[in-house]
Amino acid sequence: FLERHPDFVSNWGLVEDEETETWLGKDRRPYPLATVSNLDVLLADRSYQDQISQLKFQAFSEEHESREVVDRYVAEALKDPESRLYILLKDGQVIGTCTVDLSSDTNYIYGLVISEPERGKGYGSYLAKSLINQLIEQNDKEFQIAVEDGNVGAKRLYEKIGFVKQTQVVYLNEKE
């Protein structure tokens, strides 16, 4: 839209936010995925809440956000019937987590994170593929994810496993 209407932003007295995100989608084709003996992808329960909060706090917390905010977010995700909070266990320890929102007409994937020392080893792909395969068996929805454009690694991961760009979201703010 903004490419076709280059004067829109200035005519309305707006400025583009530096942060943009891309929405990607994927069909329902399952992945061929071999089981890895020391890895398990499970729906989380409250017994994993502290490990999940710690991982999400390290990966996603803004400077102004407290651990308590992350704890509340994880607790709500565990209770919400429209939400699935998955964990990736390696030798029984949580090394990854991802949430799926089921409240719309797609399986909306967000918050995928792998612990810092385990990144770059294919665990993010394994977690995403595994939870997608599980959801294909449970419902008839396609998949969607939004990725901050600055998060090049995550964007590359999703494109590598078959997600395709649907649109880019540009946030507009009033000029100060």
Walk through the language-model features, giving the residues of each.
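Conserved beta-strand-loop-alpha-helix junction that forms the acyl-donor binding cleft
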Residues: F1-D7, I145-K155, Y171-E176
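Acyl-donor-binding surface of acyltransferase catalytic domains
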Residues: F1-L39, L172-N173
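Conserved active-site tyrosine of GNAT-family acetyltransferases
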Residues: F8-V9, Y158, F163
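A structural microfeature
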Residues: D17-E18, G96, T167
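Short amphipathic alpha-helix that is part of the acyltransferase structural core
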Residues: L33-E68
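A conserved beta-strand-loop-helix scaffold within acyl/acetyltransferase catalytic domains
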Residues: S66-V113
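Short acidic/polar active-site loop segments enriched in Thr and Asp
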Residues: D105, K141, V164
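Conserved acetyl-CoA-binding loop-helix of GNAT-fold acetyltransferases
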Residues: I114, G120-E137, R156-K160
